[in-house]
Amino acid sequence: ACVSQEGLPADTVVPDNRNGAAALARHLIELGHRKFAILAGPTDLCAARDRLDGFHSALSSAGIELAYHNVVHGAFTRDGGYESTKRLMATGTDATCLFAVNDVMATGAMAALRDLGLRVPEDLSVAGFDDIPTLRDLTPALTTVRLPLEKMGEEAARLALDGETPDEPRVIPVQGEVIARESTAPPTRS
């Protein structure tokens, strides 16, 4: 059994990126946000696409339209988040909340906003995805989706040891958890 290795001829356990991003979107909507921007990562990365699709799906279900110009693709890195945020802000976005499809991009986004003289969350809420350990060092602390890495490892071990040999490899999605922190707050403007 594998973790996050779809396409191999073996059972695999994967994070449920789509539903995790949808849960995060619902949380942000509950805070009062209606205008969103997304740092969507590279278009050829499955995890980035799933997170974008899940977030967008939850917005659509709530009757919230996502403006095309508020979706910016860039590298899945801190610098990718920084540059994507600078491009986004140069368009004059009216978003009150920025979702970066991974925490590393969110870290770059927060640095870009700081360099532009904007405050998180007072001027723009920021959320990420992954709950990487270095988030403890960010100020303000980042709202994110925590990947259940321990649970994924346990499930992979269970699959490897269960003795079953299915005809087709199984793909087992594991749900993440929204971790609300100080980088998101109700919007101060509509």
Where are these regions (language model features)?
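Bacterial carbohydrate/catabolite-sensing allosteric modules
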Residues: 1-190
